[in-house]
């Protein structure tokens, strides 16, 4: 699988990257909230979704050690918005809904000699009443409404 990668399992589209884009967005954004912003990390994820790019910072910051080869910049774009977007970061672990996607930062699986955290994702089947009432033109399959994400410690 490439990095970043977009793939589908049973009609659910996943997007994932190993690059810590959330911390880079956090350190390079120009935004000041009047009060403490409890949804700051989800707001950063929203930038990824709005720009439809796994790396929405161009050009990369001068102090960035991200291994970005600009010849492959097109591969950072996603044509279909992922239902579940996994953006691992050293920042606090989080999970939340951004538009019609679920954004997850499972943090790091290993932290030095101690265990870290991971995301346990459960997606329930689409209820029969939603299947029967759906039209051919309807493309929404309600993934955020039928998904539970638990961030667990090892």
Residue ranges and their predicted role:
Residues 1-154:
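Extended recognition/assembly regions associated with phosphoester-bond processing machinery
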């Amino acid at each position: 699988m490439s990095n970043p990668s977009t793939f589908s399992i049973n009609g659910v589209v996943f997007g994932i990257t190993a690059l810590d884009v959330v911390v880079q967005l956090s350190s390079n954004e120009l935004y000041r909230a009047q009060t403490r912003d409890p949804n700051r990390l989800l707001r950063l994820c929203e930038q990824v979704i709005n720009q439809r790019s796994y790396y929405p910072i161009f050009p990369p910051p001068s102090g960035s050690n991200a291994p970005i080869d600009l010849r492959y910049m097109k591969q950072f774009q996603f044509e279909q918005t992922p239902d579940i977007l996994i953006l691992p970061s050293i920042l606090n672990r989080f999970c939340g809904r951004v538009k019609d996607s679920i954004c997850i930062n499972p943090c790091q699986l290993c932290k030095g000699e101690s265990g870290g955290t991971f995301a346990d994702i459960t997606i329930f089947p689409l209820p029969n009443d939603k299947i029967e009432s759906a039209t051919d033109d309807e493309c929404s399959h309600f993934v955020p409404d039928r998904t539970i994400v638990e961030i667990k410690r090892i």
